[in-house]
Structures are given as structure tokens and as C-alpha cells.
């Protein structure tokens, strides 16, 4: 059984790194009520900026897959495995959505995805080794920081890029729920230095992924 699970997670990891992700939910689209007229064409600068932001979001989902796969494998609790697995499935939707949007913007995922994935996998295993409550706290803090990034992206994305905005808005809804579920399952608040280190690492990743 563990071997089957390991093979399944390995397959998911390969899909994460190669950009071949499965969608369990359809691609979010702008609400009809928000679309009163045809959106103007994005300028080359707006298209490039949207692509950079969506590439950052795609990298975040690559990392989320690795984190939750590692944490799922590290815990012995069936109920916590279910928590991590549910989050991973929805994050795989995010991965597929952002990949689709990058393609529509005539752009590409980060060239460093294997590096991001490997690093996040190691961090997830380390968090899992510290115990379930710490691991859940790490999940909650990760989602909290992702939520802040998405808020920032909603402020930065061009108003005309309704498609990207619809994706980011749904991602934000999901991330809030994942963080809430982690705390309700027994997660603890991480110490301030740990949260600060996570922000510093995230800043390096986002700045790099925007371009590469």
C-alpha cells in the first residue's frame, strides 16, 4: 500500500515539474456580471507583466505540490493525510490553471521548476519530521503567505486581464480554506523567526520566478 502511494506521489511530482497536471475543476472564468463590455487587448507590457505574475503563481503551486506530498508521506495519521491530500488536489487544479493561462499569454513556466520542487520537497519532509502539529502549522503559515501574495497580484494585474484575475481570485478562496483546515486539524502558530525565514525564502523565489 505504501509503495502504491509512493508511486502515485512520484507520478504527481513528475506532472508538477513537467507541467502536465490534471484538472478536477474547470478553469475559472470571469463572472458574467463583471463583464459589461469586451475587454481591451493587453499591451505588450501588460501581457509580459501578467505572464511574470502568473509564472510566480505557477511556481508557488509547484512548491505546494511538493510540500503537501512530503507532509502527507511523513504523517502516520490517516485523517491528516486526507487534509494534505485534499489540499494537494486543489493545488494541482491551480497548477493546471496557471499553466493554461501562461500558454494563453504566449509565455512559459519557470525554467527552474525542478529546483523549486526539490527544495520544497525537502522542506516538507523536514516539517513533517517535527511532528503533525508543527507540520500543520507550517501548512497554515504557507497558505497565509500565499494569500498575501495573491492579494498583491490582484492589485498588480491589469484590469483588462480578466482571465488571470478570475484564476487568482479562485486560488485565493482555496488557499484561505486550506489554511483554516490546517489550524482546525491541530496546527500551531510558528515562531516569528521561522515565519520571517519563510518570507525571505519566498521573496527570493518570487523575484527569480518572475523572470526565469
From Swiss-Prot:
Where on this chain does Fe cation 1 bind? 61, 91, 94, 175
Region annotated Disordered sits at 21-42
* InterPro entries reported for this sequence: COQ7_proteobact (IPR047809), Ferritin-like (IPR012347), Ferritin-like_SF (IPR009078), Ubq_synth_Coq7 (IPR011566)
Q: Which GO terms describe its cellular component?
A: plasma membrane
What are the required cofactors? Fe cation
Q: How is the cofactor bound?
A: Binds 2 iron ions per subunit.
Q: Which GO terms describe its biological process?
A: ubiquinone biosynthetic process
- Top-rank taxon of the source lineage equals Bacteria
Group of enzyme by EC: oxidoreductase
UniProt entry keywords in alphabetical sequence: Cell membrane, Iron, Membrane, Metal-binding, Monooxygenase, Oxidoreductase, Ubiquinone biosynthesis
Where does the record place it? Cell membrane
Q: What does this protein do?
A: Catalyzes the hydroxylation of 2-nonaprenyl-3-methyl-6-methoxy-1,4-benzoquinol during ubiquinone biosynthesis.
Q: Which family does it belong to?
A: Belongs to the COQ7 family.
Name by which UniProt lists this protein: 3-demethoxyubiquinol 3-hydroxylase
Where does this protein come from, organism-wise?
Paraburkholderia xenovorans (strain LB400)
Lineage from the top down?
Answer: Bacteria, Pseudomonadati, Pseudomonadota, Betaproteobacteria, Burkholderiales
Amino acid at each position: 500500500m505504501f509503495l502504491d502511494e509512493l508511486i502515485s506521489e512520484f507520478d504527481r511530482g513528475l506532472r508538477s515539474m513537467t507541467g502536465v497536471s490534471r484538472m478536477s475543476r474547470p478553469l475559472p472564468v470571469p463572472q458574467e456580471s463583471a463583464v459589461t463590455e469586451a475587454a481591451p487587448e493587453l499591451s505588450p507590457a501588460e501581457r509580459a507583466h501578467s505572464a511574470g505574475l502568473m509564472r510566480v503563481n505557477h511556481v508557488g503551486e509547484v512548491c505546494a505540490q511538493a510540500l503537501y506530498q512530503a507532509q502527507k508521506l511523513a504523517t502516520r495519521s490517516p485523517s491528516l493525510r486526507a487534509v494534505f491530500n485534499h489540499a494537494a488536489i486543489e493545488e494541482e487544479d491551480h497548477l493546471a490553471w496557471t499553466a493554461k493561462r501562461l500558454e494563453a499569454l504566449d509565455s512559459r513556466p519557470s525554467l527552474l521548476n525542478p529546483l523549486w520542487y526539490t527544495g520544497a520537497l525537502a522542506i516538507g519532509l523536514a516539517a513533517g519530521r517535527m511532528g503533525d502539529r508543527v507540520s500543520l502549522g507550517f501548512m497554515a503559515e504557507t497558505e497565509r503567505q500565499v494569500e498575501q501574495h495573491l492579494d498583491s497580484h490582484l492589485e498588480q494585474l491589469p484590469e483588462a486581464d480578466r482571465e488571470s484575475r478570475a484564476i487568482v481570485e479562485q486560488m485565493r478562496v482555496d488557499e484561505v480554506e486550506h489554511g483554516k483546515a490546517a489550524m482546525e486539524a491541530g496546527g500551531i502558530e510558528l515562531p516569528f523567526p521561522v515565519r520571517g525565514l519563510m518570507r525571505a525564502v519566498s521573496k527570493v523565489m518570487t523575484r527569480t520566478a518572475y523572470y526565469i
